[in-house]
Amino acid sequence: MRVTVLGRLGVTTADGHTLPLDGLPRRARQVLCVLAARYDRPQSKDALADAVWGEDLPGNHVAALEHYVSLIRRTLQPGRPTSESFIVTRAGGYVFTTQRAGLDLAELRAAARAADEHPAGAADRLRLRQRIVELAVDLPFGDDEYAEWAAAPRAEVRQALLVALSELAADAVAADPARSLRLAADAVALDPYAEPPYQLAMRAAAALGRTDDALRWYDRCQHALTDELGVPPSAETAALRADIVARRGQAAAAPTPAP
């Protein structure tokens, strides 16, 4: 089976059948998500309860937690012995083991680490970056985006996706500027205060012959950085704008070929 947490929580069987999660109460889904966020690391019952309930612990939080884990096991792996569950009882707590269930968050993290081991621009590095883009249909734990336990994995996925989009956009500028522009635009949407994606969008738009569009990307960058953060675009971005303007002027001044 495979659990997905990038975006909304989902579970599929080995044959690709999607399991309905309507029978799991919200607290049970939260328990599953916390275990997924901390996969392959045993969690004490107190730590899990603190993540799920915070200061609003039920009267007997240990019993409540045990009930929800039992419900998760019965719902997602009916008929399977507890000893074979992907949620393993260990050291008085529980652990989501990726040896018994796939997890998209773990796959993304592995792809990011593997990509970093290859040199910039290498085909294998770009293939792994593309895999990250395919996996990260959205940031993880969308139903609990403001939960403290979700903050770290959400930030990690955002950064991994930003790097993947940026590297893929940079690689495509010359060969496929339209794709490069789409990827750069996605990177800007993901982090409007990161400057390199704006530079990539400017380069891609210019490569498409859309000079005005390229300059509008600079204006968006300037608005995000100057108006909202109080800092100007970098000298590199300003120089890129100047180069685009100069090339537009040269194109306008070029003589029209005789008929």
Predicted feature residues:
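Intrinsically disordered, low-complexity protein-interaction/activation regions
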Residues: 1-182, 186-192, 257
